[in-house]
């Protein structure tokens, strides 16, 4: 189950245990994994962190 969030970040939900989340971004043919292992309790904080990671990745000039 994958859904778009904001600023190019998507959330992949894994229905196991506490409901893990993986944050990712599709940049053309590249799949960028931003953060793995978040659960519902830390979701908003981890989304903000994933957005920061994606911004940093783009600033570094990655494709």
Regions found by a protein language model. Give the residues of each.
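Enriched for short, Lys/Arg-rich terminal
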Residues: 17-21, 25-63
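A short, surface-exposed loop/turn module that caps and links secondary-structure elements
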Residues: 1-16, 61-62
């Amino acid at each position: 189950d994958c859904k778009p969030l904001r600023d190019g970040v998507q959330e992949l939900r894994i229905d196991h245990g506490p409901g893990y989340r993986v944050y990712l971004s599709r940049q053309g043919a590249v799949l960028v994994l931003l953060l793995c292992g978040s659960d519902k309790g830390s979701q908003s904080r981890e989304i903000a962190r994933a957005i920061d990671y994606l911004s940093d990745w783009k600033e570094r000039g990655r494709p």
